[in-house]
Structures are given as C-alpha cells and as structure tokens.
C-alpha cells in the first residue's frame, strides 16, 4: 500500500479565513491536537508576515515532537532566512517556498519573464537547501499554468534540491479528471520526477477540493494538503478529515495508508471550530451533527436491524463519543482528573486546580456534566488564560422602553479593577457598550453567534463574536451557562485581542 503523507495548513491557510485571528496560545493548542491526530507536516504559519506570526511559528517549532514543522516563504532571501530562524529548533524543520508560474500571475502580479521565474526558483531552493534538511516548492496557480512550463519549473526545483513538489489548485479551478491527468503528465514529463514527493493542495471554489485531492492521489501524489473542517480563504480548502476517512473507508480502491489517528478527528474538528468561531454545518460530511443521524422511517428501521444498511462509517471511528459517563457535583478531584486524562488533557498542577474549581462551580448549577461540557470548560479556561481582562462582575437591569442598563467590572492581569455602566437596546448591547467605555474602544460588532454546546435547559452556551476597527478584524469566544455571561466573555476576549493588535500596528 502507498503511504500518504498529510500536510495540515490550518494554522496558515486556514487562518486566512475572514474574521479568524488566533493568538499564539490558541495556535499552540491546535498544533498539539494536530500532533495527536497524526499529521505528518504542519504549516505553522508565514514567519516573515509579522512579528506575531514569527513568534507563533517559533513556539510551535520548539513544542512539537512528532511532526515536521514548516514555515511558508516567498522566493525571497529575507523570507527564507526568517523562516529558518523561526523553525530551526524544530525536531524536523521544513521550508515551504512558493512562486507563481501561470501566465496571468507572471504578467500581472510578478511582472517577471519565464526566465526570471525559473532563475528565482533555482536560487530560492538552493538557498533553502543550504539551511533546511527538507524543502518544499509550490508552483502557485499550477492548474492554470501551461503544462510544458510547469514541468520545466518543477524540474528546475528538483535539480536545485527540492524534496517535495506541490502542485496547487490555487483558485479551485480544476476538476478531478483534469487534476489526475496533470499529475500523470508530470510523471511522464519531468526527468527527475522520482527524486521528489509530489503533493496536492486544493481549494474549494467549485466544491471539488476533496474530490480533486483524491484524484491527485490516484494520479501519483504522495502528500495531500488541506485544513481541518476545510476552512480557508474564499470557499476554503480540502477538508483533511474527509480525505482521511475516504481513504480509509475505500482502501479497497485507493490502496493507501497513512499515519492519521482517525479517532482524534472529532476532537480536532471541535477544537478548530470553537477556537476559530467557524461553526460546522450540521450536514457536513464526517463531523457534522447530522452525519450519523437518521430521520426517515425506512432508514431508522434499517439501521435498527443492521447498522451497515445505511451507515458506512461507525461514529466511534472518528471519536464521536457514545460514552454516557457523566460527572456531577459529588464527583471528586480524582475522578475529574482521570476523566480529563482520558479526554487527552495533560494539565499542570495550576491548570488542574483552576479547571477543577471551574468544574465544581459548573456542577453546582448543572446536574450532569458530560464530555462535551468538559471540553467546553477547558476551552473557556484556555481563553481566560490568554485574556488581558477578566469579568469580575456583571449586572443588568431594565430602564424603560426596551432600554437596558449594564454595569460591568473588569480586572486586568495585575489585579486592577475597572468599572463602568452603559445603556443599550437590549442586555447584550448594554453590556458591550459598558465594556467599550472601560477599554476606551470604538470597535464595530460585525458578527454575533450563539450555540448550545450540550442539550437540555442547563446547557452551556458558546458565543462567538467578531469585532472590527479600521482594517483590523478579530474574533473571540466565551463559554458559560448564562448567555449574557458567555456574551460578555466573548466580547472581552475579542476586544483584548483587538486592543493588542492595534497597539502593535501603531
């Protein structure tokens, strides 16, 4: 069986989704979960993009032990050296250098001739190999590149030392048959083809990213790139969880294997969704809430008689918990700690103490605490650790004519408290106005979403907000049993990130 490598770009391409702005701690959280998932290569970011990106890539590179850590770089010496400084301490550092090869990009974006492009590819890969043990070259907009020139560019990159060649469908233009044929063409037309691993990278503009990725694998690609939940700019990228499960379920056809730990898919998908604020459609393949639901009477009858009549994927395969194990207010520290370990959380004593206190507070208000509650609780605690301000007091009361008044007390990391009050057309608007007054900000709320994490009247609420000031847009989330408290936490989380961002760019 062919071994397929999985390269995840959730932290780079995925973060380019509008409104997604992960901080360093959140990126590290996702990176560690990707490591548990069995990802072979993770693109931690674009080190040369900003100091914040550089620090995030550097920290991930120093923390990950069981996957290659890669930084994106343009075909520029400064970018390549910056990428090296960021990932040089990784167990397995890798460079991803790219340059466009299509006529439209060379003419209008690069303003370069074909000869200039080939020379730039040669020089950048040579430099990369002098610094990195592994170099990946991407021919940006490969699917709209004239095939003879693409083959020439790929040959130049391999001869210069490129170990991996990526053939990206940058604008989601191709279709499965065409993409398969392109990989076959390169196999026949590139003299040094056998000296490199070929990779596919598909965007979903025409809804074919996963299908194209699978076609590329059939065509000879040994590495597949994408993101968790298919997030990314425009219509997103190939959803890696869909590719992984498709290869597993239809291994009779694809005859491949990979290092992906399928039972970690659900946990990874949920974490990425909640940290980015990009909710998963209920009907999404593999990880959607309805992926294993049956409403039709005929389907229900069939499943009850024999599950394989209408289910080709067992929920347990992807870690969809069927566990009815619950905790409650009488559960002790030992039971809580053991359950957190079973869910994959390795906590320090300080983190364990804080999480247990939060658990006991929740257990006083909620009869039964499920695994989903615990995951949400940990997500909320992680958010609190990265916030500049925490909510100490929140009070709302009715004034008149649908006007509400909110009083908010925030506390910063040094213990200083700040209090203010404001009115609004509803409780949430009043709370947000009060927080704005305290933080002296005039940001605009561009998105507000609320989701029930578990079922029942005592369910936890997960609120996601997006704030914008000028060209800068960030997201934040809050988790609490009370909707107003969750909403306030989400706003403070986002506002703190935006305030820090504005301070950096001034």
UniProtKB/Swiss-Prot annotation:
PANTHER family: 2-ISOPROPYLMALATE SYNTHASE 1, CHLOROPLASTIC-RELATED, HOMOCITRATE SYNTHASE-RELATED
Annotated region (Regulatory domain), positions in chain: 390-506
The protein's name in its UniProt record: 2-isopropylmalate synthase
Residue ranges of domain Pyruvate carboxyltransferase in the record: 4-266
Cofactor: Mn(2+)
Subunit structure comment from the entry: Homodimer.
Lineage: Bacteria, Bacillati, Bacillota, Bacilli, Bacillales
Subcellular location: Cytoplasm
Family named by the database record: Belongs to the alpha-IPM synthase/homocitrate synthase family. LeuA type 1 subfamily.
Binding-site list for Mn(2+): 13, 201, 203, 237
GO cellular component, one term: cytoplasm
SUPFAM superfamilies documented for this protein: 2-isopropylmalate synthase LeuA, allosteric (dimerisation) domain (SSF110921), Aldolase (SSF51569)
Pathway terms, separated by semicolons: Amino-acid biosynthesis; L-leucine biosynthesis; L-leucine from 3-methyl-2-oxobutanoate: step 1/4
Keywords tagged on the record: Amino-acid biosynthesis, Branched-chain amino acid biosynthesis, Cytoplasm, Leucine biosynthesis, Manganese, Metal-binding, Transferase
Catalytic activity: 3-methyl-2-oxobutanoate + acetyl-CoA + H2O = (2S)-2-isopropylmalate + CoA + H(+)
Predominant location category: cytoplasm
Function of the molecule: Catalyzes the condensation of the acetyl group of acetyl-CoA with 3-methyl-2-oxobutanoate (2-ketoisovalerate) to form 3-carboxy-3-hydroxy-4-methylpentanoate (2-isopropylmalate).
GO BP term, example: L-leucine biosynthetic process
EC number: 2.3.3.13
Organism: Bacillus cytotoxicus (strain DSM 22905 / CIP 110041 / 391-98 / NVH 391-98)
GO MF term list: 2-isopropylmalate synthase activity; acetyl-CoA C-acetyltransferase activity; manganese ion binding
